Design a protein with these regions (language model features):
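Active-site gating loops and adjacent loop-to-helix segments of metal-dependent hydrolytic enzymes
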Residues: 82-124
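Charged catalytic cores and adjacent phosphate/nucleic-acid-binding surfaces used
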Residues: 1-7, 13-35, 46-92, 128, ...
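Ser/Thr-glycine-rich phosphate-binding loops at phosphate-binding pockets of nucleotides
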Residues: 11, 39-41
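Alpha-helix-centered segments that form part of catalytic cores
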Residues: 111-145
Length: 271
């Protein structure tokens, strides 16, 4: 049985997100739109994950916890955990190596964390989307040390992606690679404008070599209307992913196996 899954979503904690998109709002909208496996991935913080967990368990949604981390190269990566405590611990670590630049809510947006009823519990002082003192080479190892996985985010976007910062998708301990659209095409590297169908056509662009990693899509929700706009299917029964039954945390081994069954793509060797 396939489970509709969405692994990249923000909440009111991210300054670029809507204050209306609380963890409760995210979980309720996703559940109403058929999502069964849902991750909360605010910028460099997991402070809204406890509230998110409570609402997901109440709704029967399988939650994953973590963040969209910004590496030293300004590459966005999803760091995901099946354990709430592991996600919270990694969040504390990430904040300790975040560039300590104060947030100005009037200029860059609010950064509030809330309880499961949307009551504000506090506000984060430093601007969360800033880079961590952690390279793309190191992030997979660090997340694994907390029991998590890493998925490079929106690799086909022209900003804050592997291709925008490095030009290519690089090898690493990635559980999957996230794309905005499948198959992944980029328009911001040399040769991207040379597609056969002409500028602006969906088939124009450079077909991106994602090195055979499993591919996912995601909503990257920042506003309520974004929720569940680009989910994907995980080929796994709910009882295998969540062996403890409803209201319990997912099994990381099962999640990795399910991601490994996702479609993959690699450019043929011209040689």
């Amino acid at each position: 049985m396939a489970l509709l899954t969405d692994l990249h979503n923000h909440s009111c904690l991210s300054p670029c997100g809507s204050l209306d998109l609380s963890p409760r709002c995210l979980a309720e909208l996703a559940a109403a739109r058929g999502v069964k496996v849902l991750a909360l991935t605010d910028h460099n913080s997991s402070l809204n994950c406890p509230a998110f967990a409570k609402v997901c368990f109440r709704l029967g949604v399988i939650p994953l916890f973590g963040m969209e981390a910004t590496t030293a190269e300004e590459i966005h990566c999803l760091c995901l955990f099946t354990s709430l405590e592991a996600g919270r611990a990694f969040g504390e670590y990430a904040y300790s190596i975040l560039i300590p630049f104060p947030n100005d809510p009037e200029k860059t947006g609010d950064q509030v964390y809330v309880d499961e009823e949307d009551n504000i519990e506090g506000e984060v002082a430093y601007f969360l989307p800033n880079a961590l003192d952690l390279s793309i080479e190191a992030i997979g190892e660090r997340a694994a040390g907390y029991g998590g996985i890493v998925i490079p985010a929106h690799v086909d976007r022209p900003a804050f992606s592997m291709t925008s910062q490095l030009g290519v998708v690089t090898a690493g301990p990635w559980a999957a690679v996230e794309c905005v659209r499948l198959p992944p095409r980029v328009f911001h590297v040399p040769g991207a404008a040379d597609g056969p169908a002409g500028a602006g056509h969906p088939d124009t662009g450079y077909l991106l070599d994602t090195l055979g990693y499993p591919l996912t899509t995601s909503s990257d929700a920042h506003y309520p209307e974004h929720v569940a706009r680009r989910p994907f299917e995980l080929d796994i029964p709910a009882e295998e992913l969540q062996p403890g039954g409803p209201g319990t945390e997912a099994d990381m081994g099962a999640l990795k196996r399910a991601l490994g069954r996702r479609p993959a793509f690699r450019q043929p060797d011209d040689g």
